[in-house]
Amino acid sequence: MSSLTIRDQKTDDLLTPENSTVIIIDYQATQVGSIESTDKYRMVQNTIALVKLAKVFKMPIVVSTVNVKTGINGPTIPQIAHEVKDLPSYDRTTINAWEDKEFLEAVKATKRKKLIIAALWTEACLLFPALDALKDGYEVYPVVDAVGGTSVVAHEAALRRMENAGAQPTGIMSLICEIQRDWGRGETVPGMLGVLAGIGNGVGLSVGYRQEP
């Protein structure tokens, strides 16, 4: 039972802690409250899991909001804000985060070409930066079970448009497994199991039971 030598984490075709950036856009009360394409609670839990995953594996996280400083919108919801409280949050007036100077500079500063993106709504604040990032040579991985739209058809149409442009949809369970990759990498297993336990689906509940004394 021997694992192969770990591939170069910076050049690996799969997502790794050293070649990927996690981007969280517009998880604010107005946006979360207007989601109609999926279960809001599960969506938020999956987004929290995404942030926790990035923290366990020390991946860069870029956080952005829209229209907080103008007074039109509120800040990132507390459940997620608690997890990113030590990180800068780039507030914008642009619906497309890729057209905001500070946000774009923050993404470029990570020097990572694989972008794992969760944003609300799917049909706007996820779709637009995803298309622009693809055009600029980035690989884009929308986290489909951590995002939502104002309707099922709008959400699904936006995902199709991104995929047709070259985006590679993924989900939170797939990401957790892809980033961990090998149970033999024991230093991150406890943190990874903690992320799994917090999701609340069948796998998360099973892990939670196993972790109980």
Model-identified regions with their sequence ranges:
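Active-site-adjacent betaalpha module
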Residues: 2-21, 57, 69-213
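A short alpha/beta connector and helix-capping loop motif
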Residues: 18-20, 35-63
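Short acidic catalytic loops
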Residues: 21-28
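A cross-domain feature marking catalytic cores of carbohydrate-active enzymes
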Residues: 27, 63-65, 144
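Short acidic, Gly/Ser-rich segments with clustered Asp/Glu that frequently serve as metal-coordination loops
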Residues: 28-34
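Short, well-ordered turn and helix-capping elements at secondary-structure junctions
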Residues: 35, 65-67, 94
